Amino acid sequence: MKKTIAAAIIGLAATLSLSACEGGTGSSDYTPSVPVFIQMPGGQLFPVMI
């Protein structure tokens, strides 16, 4: 359970850092809403919009 939460936090942090880098370019065609699927215990996927 703790590994799943840690993996989700690491994945979220990596995605946010990538979004911050992309957003800093000033490109108007960049869409910040990206669905990220986090696997929950039991094999269920939980979509998170970033």
Curated annotation (Swiss-Prot):
Source taxon at top rank: Viruses
Protein name: Gene 38 protein
Gene: 38
